[in-house]
Each structure stands twice: as C-alpha cells, then as structure tokens.
Amino acid sequence: MSLYFNADTMRIERSSVHEPKRNRNVFLDVKPIADDANVNVPPRQAARRNATVFNNRVGFPPLTPKEAFVDAVPADQTCMVFESSKPIYLVLRAIGVLPYTRLPSGGTAFVLASPSMTYCVLFFLLLTVYIAFILLNRIEIVRTLEGRFEESVIAYLFIVNILPILIIPLMWYESRKVVSVVNGWVDFETVYRETTGRALELRLRTKAQVIAILLPILCSLSVAITHVTMVDFKLLQVIPYCVLDTITYMMGGYWYMACETLSITAKILAEDFQRALRHVGPAAKVSEYRSLWLRLSKLARDTGFSTCYTFTFICLYLFFIITLSIYGLMSQISDGFGVKDIGLAVTAFCSVGLLFYICDEAHYASFNVRTNFQKKLLMVELSWMNTDAQTEINMFLRATEMNPSSINLGGFFDVNRTLFKSLLATMVTYLVVLLQFQISIPDEPSAMLMHSNSSHS
C-alpha cells in the first residue's frame, strides 16, 4: 500500500502495488466517447460499466469527484485545431482547392454531392478556360522568339508557372485524407481534455488570419512586379497568374499551420507530462500520456500521407522554378542586370523561401514530437516511482523508438532540412552543367566573324 498526492482532486489517495493489472492497451483507431454521450444510461448500469471497462474510453479511469461537477464542453471547443486554422481552410475552399463540408455535429467531411464541391468544380473549369487562352498566347510568343535560350527564360517561365493548376485536382483526390486528419485532431483533443481536465489551447488563430490575408496580397504583388518588367505586359493576363501563385503559397501556408500545430501540441504535451510526473501514483497516468503521444505521432505521419502527391508535385515544381530562374539570372552576368531580371530575382527568392519553410517546419515538428519528448523521458527520475510506473516509463521510451514521427510524403521522401540541402545540391549541379553548355556555344556575332574570315581565306 502506498500513498500519493493527486493534484487534480487535491486529495491524498492510495494505491496498492499488488493490485491486479488492468488492460492498458492503446487503440489509436478507436474514436473516444465523450462524457455526455451516456446521459440516458441508468446509474446502476453506468457504474457497473465504469468498474469493468473504464467508461469505455481508451484506457482511462472513470471520472474523479472533481470532474463530476464540471459542465460539458461546448461543441465549438472540441475542434480547436480546426478553428485555429479555419481562415486558411476558408481561403483554400474559396480558390477551389479544398472542398470540405462542416457537419452539424461539429465534424468535417468530404462529400462529392455538396455545394462546396460544386463551387470548386465551377471555379476550376472557369480558371482552366481562362488559362487555356493565355497558354495559347504564351506559346505563340515563344515561337516568335529569336536569340539564345537564356535571353528568353522569362517567356518559358510564364509557361511553367501555369503548372500549379494541377494542385487543384490533386487536392480533390486527397481531400478525404485531409478531412480524416482534421477529425483525428478532434479525437485527440477529446482524449487530451479527458486526461488533463482542460482544453487544448494553441493560440494560432492570429497567425492563420495574417497568413490568409497577407499571402494573397504578396503573391499578387510579386506577379505584378514580374509582369511589369516584361515588354508584352497585359493586365488581363495577371489575374490567373495571381490565382495560381496564391494556390501554391496558400498550400505552403496550410503546411506551415499543420506543422506548427504539431510542434506546439508536442510542447504542451511534454510540459503536461513533466508536470504530471511530480505526483505520479498509479501507473495509469503514464499510460494515458503514452496513448496521447501515440495519437500525436500518428497525426504527424498522417499529415504527410494526407497530402503526399500534392506536396511532392509542389516540391518538384519549386525545384524546377528555382533552377530556371537562377539560370536566367546567372546567364546575364556578362551583359549586366536589367529591368527584366527583377522578375527572375523575385521569383527565385520567393520559391527558395517557400521550399525552405516547407522543409524546415516539417523538420521542426518531427523534432518536437519525437526527439524533444524522448529527452523529457530520459530525464525522469525513476528511483522514487513504484514498479508499475517505472515499467510504463520504459514502455513509453520503447514506443517513441518504435513509432517514427517523421513527416513522410507517401514513402517518397522525408520532409526535413536534409531534403532542402539535397535539392539545393542537385540544383547547383544542374546550373553548373547548363552554364558550361552555354559557355561552350559561341555568340552569333563571333560565329559570323569566324565564318567571314574563313570565307575570305
């Protein structure tokens, strides 16, 4: 028999070392049942069920006397993650990328026969028709170009900039997985609230609002700068390019918010776990945090898998844009920079920044979910804990080793800083080859002079 102080109930409770071990298996695919789901159950039947299966939750004990007097949590507080990123979701739906539907129960769903899907399809068809006319015009401009390739990089770049329209159908294909991740966060918040007694507070709403407002403005500004520096500037051609750039960078904003949510949640969970270890009695408390961490680790993996094809395409597209833009800039070094090179510089800078943030935020989220949590576990003092608690701590450490928390794009590659370094190294290799190929080709005036000299001789 051992005594310990429970900070939640403010009482000294006792636990027996020789008590029979209850089943603490963690089922990550089981949806937790809210406390108010069993209002009509008779008291005797509810008490019998609580005594046997812990109120049918995922390894959690029944309510404490303190929690019995807590009011039910409002529905809008059970999906704080969605509410924090809601401005970005609204912008993505407005530009036809993410046709999600909010259910009356508070969940999120992807329904083909829904008003949001109909709007996204109509928006995509109108944008496709608009871009088709612009593409024909751009192809005609490329055909009439004369001179070397490096002198017409911007014209080719405008054709490549049409490719982000493929993001829309790719996201439609993956919207069901994205919605599943959003609902997974709702389940995580439910389990977190039942474990800690309070709601998950992220405080990311302001960041999401800033991203949703500033990114479309900055994208439109960069596209306008690029078009103004062109000789054949046409105002009507700026609008679809602004939409396409907004789609690309708003997907970057979505990725940033997803990774930032993982990072902040991992930090909060680590602090709560460290605070709970100060008064650990039964080993069930450690088991509860282990189940929470396993859910968070699964959410980190699902974040990458849910948009694997979309962000694989975005990374390859950004790599191609960066290579083409920097090649156009470096090829003009001998002739000096002009006004038209401003657009190339802006495009290269923005693309490098977006690619860096995609890789860096995923790296930071993976570090906080796994490595930072392992440090907290390794710093735990086990000498004063009972045997069951020590066993649960060791099982927790083993779980962090066996469950990878890296954000992986469908098995293609891990998104981290190593990916950014590899892409830059490959880009430098391509640039060196292209510049050597350019140097080996003589200019037209020198070629004509050599031809005239040979004819005179």
Swiss-Prot record:
Q: Please give the chief subcellular localization of this protein.
A: membrane
Give the Cytoplasmic membrane side ranges.
Answer: 1-115, 174-209, 259-309, 363-421
User: Glycosylation annotated at which residues?
Assistant: 453
A GO CC annotation recorded here is: neuronal cell body
Where it sits in the cell: the answer is: Cell membrane
Its membrane topology: Multi-pass membrane protein
**A Pfam family annotated for this UniProt entry:** 7tm_7
What GO molecular-function term can you cite, just one? olfactory receptor activity
Tissue expression notes: Carbon dioxide-responsive neurons coexpress GPRgr22 and GPRgr24 in the maxillary palp, at both larval and adult life stages.
Q: Does the keyword S-adenosyl-L-methionine apply?
A: no
Q: Which residues lie on this side of the membrane: Extracellular?
A: 137-152, 231-237, 331-341, 443-457
Transmembrane annotation, as ranges: 116-136, 153-173, 210-230, 238-258, 310-330, 342-362, 422-442
GO biological process terms on file: response to carbon dioxide; sensory perception of smell; sensory perception of taste; signal transduction
Role this protein plays: Gustatory receptor which mediates acceptance or avoidance behavior, depending on its substrates. GPRgr22 and GPRgr24 together are sufficient for olfactory carbon dioxide-chemosensation.
Family listed: Belongs to the insect chemoreceptor superfamily. Gustatory receptor (GR) family. Gr21a subfamily.
Name of protein? Gustatory and odorant receptor 24
- Organism per entry: Anopheles gambiae
User: Corresponding gene?
Assistant: GPRgr24
